[in-house]
Amino acid sequence: SIILLLFFGNKEPEITFTNQQMQISGIYGNDYNLSDIESVTLINERPVTTFKTNGFDMGGIKKGHFNVQNEGNCLLFVSGTGKCIRLKTKSDVIYINFADETKTEELYGKLEGMVK
């Protein structure tokens, strides 16, 4: 079971869009209504976490619930060290990035066009 946790924990989430929803796959993934997303922002670096409340944290990969400095409890899907997307929904703050910064920027462009 530890091997499975390492495998799924190290795997980047897939993010798909269907029926006015954003689906984040994998461990700690969920479905979010696009209408519930209040803002989407591209920030230059990943958030500073103070501690993990329920998540996976290994080798710079952070997935799950973390306390973020100056924000409190947030949901992270962070694999890279560069730019990061910050989503504010009606109920959560979510940070997403990928090891490939271009992939992060492409997702941001897509979200920015979908969120009104």
Listing of model-derived features with the role each one plays in the protein:
Residues 1:
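Short, conserved beta-strand/beta-arch hydrophobic-aromatic motifs that form part
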Residues 4-35, 39-41:
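Conserved beta-hairpin
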Residues 25-33, 39-90:
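Non-transmembrane, membrane-adjacent beta-strand/coil modules in membrane-associated proteins
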Residues 35, 46, 79-116:
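Terminal and domain-flanking low-complexity segments
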